[in-house]
UniProtKB/Swiss-Prot annotation:
Protein name as it appears in the record: Uncharacterized N-acetyltransferase C56E4.07
Principal location: Golgi
GO cellular component annotations of the record: endoplasmic reticulum; endoplasmic reticulum membrane; Golgi apparatus; Golgi membrane
Keyword Transit peptide in record: no
Organism: Schizosaccharomyces pombe (strain 972 / ATCC 24843)
Gene3D superfamilies registered for this protein in UniProt: 3.40.630.30
Record carries keyword Acyltransferase: yes
GO-annotated molecular function: acyltransferase activity, transferring groups other than amino-acyl groups
Pfam families noted in UniProt: Acetyltransf_10
EC number: 2.3.1.-
Membrane-related topology note: Peripheral membrane protein
Top-level lineage group: Eukaryota
Length: 235
């Protein structure tokens, strides 16, 4: 059955470089009320916030191990966005991909310097450490078959509630079911119920605390979806 949004078929395609700015705009709208995002960019201008969020999208685009998907309709080329990675990643990376990822890393460091946003870079690094510790506690890193890490999913706020998030996530879920491996993500408050509906269960809680002030920013649930078992006629 074809998924529709406002009567139009919902489709998807790989993220292209020229999509990065528009996808970033959707991301900023989708997470405008996120306490985590407000903390990450606290004290920064809207211009800086957009520039650095665009760089996050570039980071995903230039990572050869990350799958980036854009959902769209005939009238709206940017309905939603998904980025995920299969772990452990394929160790075979082309020289071209390695060079592009390395150059992007240098450019990322330049941007933080250019915008005087080293504190934002520090917060992101600290955030990654907290989420990484949460992932370690799940035991998934020791899973011999691996797992799929959902890095990012967002939907245009005007179109949320139409099943777009589930549509995007099903692409990762289908791959997980094929390999019979779990999916892991850190849930946003706004999408928590959707993740539960899709079969995710809370496995761990990461307490995101401001390293400088000691303020508790958010208790972030780390959630796991176990793969669906193949039906008898598929085995």
């Amino acid at each position: 059955m074809v998924k529709t949004v406002n009567g139009e078929p919902l489709r998807h395609r790989p993220l292209q470089f020229n999509d990065i700015e528009r996808v970033t705009e959707v991301s900023l709208l989708a997470f405008s009320d996120s306490a985590t995002w407000k903390w990450r960019f606290k004290g920064m201008s809207s211009e800086t916030m957009k520039a650095l969020t665009m760089q996050l999208t570039r980071d995903a685009y230039f990572d050869p191990h990350v799958t980036c998907i854009v959902a769209y309709t005939d009238s709206n080329p940017y309905v939603g966005f998904l980025a995920f990675k299969k772990f452990p990643p394929d160790p075979n990376v082309s020289y071209r991909d390695w060079i592009l990822k390395s150059l992007n890393k240098y450019y990322s460091n330049f941007l933080y310097w250019w915008y005087g946003a080293q504190i934002v870079q520090k917060r992101f690094h600290y955030n990654e450490l907290q989420y990484g510790a949460a992932l370690y506690k799940t035991g998934l890193l020791k899973n011999p078959k691996g797992f799929i890490h959902i890095h990012f999913v967002c939907v245009d706020p005007a179109l949320q509630g139409n099943g777009v998030g589930g549509y995007l996530l099903d692409m990762a879920h289908d791959l997980a079911d094929e390999y019979q491996i779990p999916c892991f993500l850190m849930a946003s408050k706004m999408a928590f119920k959707m993740y539960e509906h899709l079969g995710y269960k809370t496995s761990v809680i990461a307490n995101l605390v401001d390293e400088d002030t000691g303020e508790l920013i958010r208790e972030s649930p780390g959630m796991i979806r176990e793969p669906k078992q193949p039906s008898s006629h598929e085995t």
